[in-house]
């Protein structure tokens, strides 16, 4: 009987020492919370960056589609912005009526990404304006201007203040179309740059410079 009791006591003691104490559990929970607090914002930022860059890529692709169609059909086409079913879009205005019609090339901005109202100011959380390396001009066309492509496939500033609208080449400046999103900790910025020769590229703001 005594032998049984001693064995049982040893067994009970073994069970107690093989588990976790409350302090150990609290430490584990604390470590998990710290890691999650660091990782989750980084993950959300990475997802936002992917969506922002995807929208910029889709817009650049749409611009190239407009360029190809303009050269193919020997017609000037402009790229306009609007909404469809509550989503922000950009489209190639094939019939020149200034509104989106079924069958026209279109792209939709993803997530919370929206076209900017114009060139960022460089203050209040906004980046500085993008400057194309090697360009000697003093500024660029931006979201306040309408990008068009002539029948030669060259970009132009589509001017609707004239009747009919004019789109002369070569353009006086290069084009930069900005977009931004809303994310944890602020906003992200990207842009599509179109050179005077019609070449398009994507740039993103990393918090201190465009690259």
Regions inferred by a protein language model and the residue ranges of each:
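N-terminal helix-rich module
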Residues: 2-10, 23, 29, 34, ...
């Amino acid at each position: 009987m005594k032998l049984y009791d001693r064995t049982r006591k040893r067994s009970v003691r073994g069970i107690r020492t093989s588990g976790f104490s409350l302090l150990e559990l609290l430490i584990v929970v604390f470590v998990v919370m710290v890691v999650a607090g660091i990782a989750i914002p980084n993950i959300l930022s990475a997802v936002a960056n992917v969506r922002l860059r995807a929208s910029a890529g889709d817009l650049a692709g749409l611009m190239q589609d407009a360029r190809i169609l303009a050269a193919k059909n020997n017609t000037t086409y402009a790229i306009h912005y609007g909404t469809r079913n509550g989503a922000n879009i950009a489209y190639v205005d094939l019939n020149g009526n200034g509104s989106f019609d079924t069958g026209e090339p279109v792209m939709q901005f993803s997530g919370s990404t929206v076209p900017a109202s114009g060139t960022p100011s460089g203050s209040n959380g906004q980046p500085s304006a993008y400057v194309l390396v090697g360009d000697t001009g003093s500024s660029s066309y931006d979201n306040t201007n309408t990008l068009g492509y002539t029948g030669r496939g060259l970009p132009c500033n589509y001017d609707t203040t004239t009747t009919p609208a004019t789109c002369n080449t070569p353009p006086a400046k290069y084009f930069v179309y900005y977009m931004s999103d809303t994310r944890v900790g602020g906003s992200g910025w990207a842009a599509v740059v179109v050179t005077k020769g019609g070449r398009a590229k994507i740039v993103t703001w990393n918090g201190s410079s465009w690259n």
